[in-house]
Amino acid sequence: MEQRLAERLSAAQLPEANDIAWAGVWLESCGYTGLMFLREALADEQKSLPLARDALGIDLQNVSCAFLAPAIMREVSANGRAFLRNVRHGLFLLPFTVRENMAIGCPIDPAFAVGGERHKNPYAEKLALAAANGLDIDDALWSAVTLT
Protein backbone atom coordinates (compact mmCIF):
# COMPACT_ATOMS: atom_id res chain seq x y z
CA MET A 1 0.00 0.00 0.00
CA GLU A 2 2.71 2.47 1.00
CA GLN A 3 4.81 1.68 -2.07
CA ARG A 4 1.89 2.06 -4.46
CA LEU A 5 0.92 5.37 -2.89
CA ALA A 6 4.54 6.58 -3.09
CA GLU A 7 4.69 5.66 -6.78
CA ARG A 8 1.51 7.61 -7.50
CA LEU A 9 2.72 10.64 -5.56
CA SER A 10 6.07 10.49 -7.38
CA ALA A 11 4.24 10.33 -10.70
CA ALA A 12 2.45 13.52 -9.66
CA GLN A 13 5.93 15.04 -9.21
CA LEU A 14 5.55 15.54 -5.48
CA PRO A 15 8.90 15.88 -3.73
CA GLU A 16 9.39 13.55 -0.78
CA ALA A 17 6.68 11.21 -2.07
CA ASN A 18 8.07 8.26 -0.09
CA ASP A 19 7.89 10.17 3.20
CA ILE A 20 4.41 11.49 2.42
CA ALA A 21 3.16 7.99 1.61
CA TRP A 22 4.80 6.52 4.72
CA ALA A 23 3.22 9.18 6.94
CA GLY A 24 -0.24 8.75 5.40
CA VAL A 25 -0.20 4.99 5.89
CA TRP A 26 1.30 5.40 9.39
CA LEU A 27 -1.58 7.68 10.37
CA GLU A 28 -4.15 5.24 8.97
CA SER A 29 -2.43 2.41 10.87
CA CYS A 30 -2.92 4.36 14.09
CA GLY A 31 -6.59 5.05 13.38
CA TYR A 32 -6.17 8.64 12.14
CA THR A 33 -7.48 10.13 8.90
CA GLY A 34 -4.15 10.41 7.09
CA LEU A 35 -5.43 9.57 3.63
CA MET A 36 -8.45 11.84 3.94
CA PHE A 37 -6.15 14.74 4.82
CA LEU A 38 -3.85 13.75 1.95
CA ARG A 39 -6.79 13.78 -0.46
CA GLU A 40 -7.68 17.30 0.71
CA ALA A 41 -4.06 18.44 0.40
CA LEU A 42 -3.68 17.05 -3.11
CA ALA A 43 -6.44 19.42 -4.23
CA ASP A 44 -4.48 22.44 -2.96
CA GLU A 45 -2.69 24.63 -5.46
CA GLN A 46 0.26 25.38 -3.16
CA LYS A 47 2.19 22.34 -2.02
CA SER A 48 5.52 23.84 -0.97
CA LEU A 49 6.83 26.74 1.05
CA PRO A 50 10.30 27.94 1.98
CA LEU A 51 10.50 27.62 5.75
CA ALA A 52 11.74 30.74 7.51
CA ARG A 53 11.78 31.50 11.22
CA ASP A 54 10.70 34.88 12.48
CA ALA A 55 10.22 36.25 15.99
CA LEU A 56 7.07 34.13 16.41
CA GLY A 57 8.40 30.87 14.93
CA ILE A 58 7.48 29.53 11.49
CA ASP A 59 4.41 30.66 9.55
CA LEU A 60 3.22 27.73 7.44
CA GLN A 61 0.67 29.93 5.64
CA ASN A 62 -1.90 27.10 5.67
CA VAL A 63 0.16 24.96 3.30
CA SER A 64 -0.56 21.34 4.20
CA CYS A 65 1.85 19.55 6.50
CA ALA A 66 1.22 16.50 4.33
CA PHE A 67 3.81 18.13 2.06
CA LEU A 68 5.81 20.23 4.54
CA ALA A 69 6.36 17.73 7.38
CA PRO A 70 9.70 16.31 6.14
CA ALA A 71 11.15 19.81 5.66
CA ILE A 72 9.79 20.98 9.01
CA MET A 73 11.45 18.04 10.73
CA ARG A 74 14.78 18.78 9.06
CA GLU A 75 14.50 22.43 10.09
CA VAL A 76 13.65 21.61 13.71
CA SER A 77 16.38 18.97 13.90
CA ALA A 78 18.92 21.51 12.68
CA ASN A 79 17.72 24.58 14.60
CA GLY A 80 15.75 23.34 17.61
CA ARG A 81 12.20 23.64 18.85
CA ALA A 82 9.89 25.84 16.78
CA PHE A 83 6.43 27.28 17.25
CA LEU A 84 4.36 26.65 14.12
CA ARG A 85 1.42 28.81 13.16
CA ASN A 86 -1.19 28.81 10.40
CA VAL A 87 -0.89 25.03 10.38
CA ARG A 88 -2.99 22.85 8.07
CA HIS A 89 -3.05 19.07 8.49
CA GLY A 90 -0.61 19.24 11.40
CA LEU A 91 -1.36 15.61 12.18
CA PHE A 92 1.06 14.73 9.35
CA LEU A 93 3.91 15.78 11.65
CA LEU A 94 3.01 13.11 14.21
CA PRO A 95 4.60 10.10 12.46
CA PHE A 96 7.84 12.00 11.97
CA THR A 97 8.00 13.23 15.56
CA VAL A 98 7.37 9.73 16.90
CA ARG A 99 10.05 8.26 14.62
CA GLU A 100 12.56 10.89 15.78
CA ASN A 101 11.47 10.75 19.46
CA MET A 102 10.63 14.44 19.23
CA ALA A 103 7.97 16.21 21.28
CA ILE A 104 4.96 17.76 19.57
CA GLY A 105 2.18 20.04 20.77
CA CYS A 106 -1.44 19.38 19.81
CA PRO A 107 -1.21 18.71 16.05
CA ILE A 108 -4.86 19.48 15.41
CA ASP A 109 -4.51 23.06 16.62
CA PRO A 110 -3.79 25.81 14.07
CA ALA A 111 -0.62 26.65 16.02
CA PHE A 112 1.66 24.42 18.14
CA ALA A 113 5.30 23.68 18.99
CA VAL A 114 7.55 20.92 17.65
CA GLY A 115 10.85 19.94 19.21
CA GLY A 116 12.35 18.57 22.37
CA GLU A 117 12.57 14.91 23.31
CA ARG A 118 9.85 12.27 23.50
CA HIS A 119 10.49 9.41 25.91
CA LYS A 120 7.86 6.89 24.83
CA ASN A 121 6.28 5.67 21.60
CA PRO A 122 2.56 5.36 22.36
CA TYR A 123 1.82 4.07 18.85
CA ALA A 124 3.92 0.89 18.69
CA GLU A 125 1.01 -1.40 19.57
CA LYS A 126 -1.33 0.15 16.99
CA LEU A 127 1.32 -0.07 14.30
CA ALA A 128 2.01 -3.72 15.11
CA LEU A 129 -1.70 -4.56 14.88
CA ALA A 130 -2.01 -2.79 11.54
CA ALA A 131 1.05 -4.61 10.21
CA ALA A 132 -0.39 -7.95 11.32
CA ASN A 133 -4.00 -7.39 10.25
CA GLY A 134 -3.71 -4.92 7.37
CA LEU A 135 -5.76 -1.80 6.82
CA ASP A 136 -9.31 -1.34 5.60
CA ILE A 137 -9.28 1.76 3.38
CA ASP A 138 -12.37 3.11 1.64
CA ASP A 139 -12.09 2.40 -2.12
CA ALA A 140 -13.12 5.92 -3.15
CA LEU A 141 -10.59 7.47 -0.78
CA TRP A 142 -7.84 5.14 -1.99
CA SER A 143 -8.62 6.01 -5.62
CA ALA A 144 -8.52 9.71 -4.79
CA VAL A 145 -5.09 9.62 -3.14
CA THR A 146 -3.53 7.25 -5.66
CA LEU A 147 -4.76 9.50 -8.48
CA THR A 148 -6.60 6.70 -10.28
Which role does the model predict for each range below?
Residues 15-16, 108:
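Residue-level detector of short coil/turn "hinge" positions at structural boundaries
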